[in-house]
Amino acid sequence: MKKRLLWRGIDAEVHEVSLGQNFNPNDYDIFFIGGGQDFEQSVLLKDLKGEKGKNIIKAIEDEKVFLAICGGYQMLGQYYKTWDGKQCDFLGALNLYTVGEKKRLIGDFSFKLDE
């Protein structure tokens, strides 16, 4: 993403926010949230239960821009239910949920929200 901005003459700084590290959402213009396997998501979810999660919700409520891929967008939603019925509660910042199936769906998605 940084490289694409630089190609367009837009200067950008990238700040990584690690596990256990909080951030001020007012200090950022855009947020990127990647994904991971179920175990890695469970580790991250523990980290999101505190101030970091509240700050992500605040950034969404303040209409900040997010690019969330893979499990990143799932973690912004209400919950993820695995194909075998286990439910993982997520941030609830967005009114969406994910239900897994035995056969995984992999590819690009596009969503349109009703206002």
Where are these regions (language model features)?
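N-terminal beta1-alpha1 cap of cysteine-dependent amidohydrolase-like domains
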Residues: 1-58
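Short, glycine- and charge-enriched coil/turn segments that flank and shape catalytic ligand pockets
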Residues: 11, 21-22, 81-85, 115
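Short acidic, glycine-rich loop/turn motifs
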Residues: 5-7, 112-115
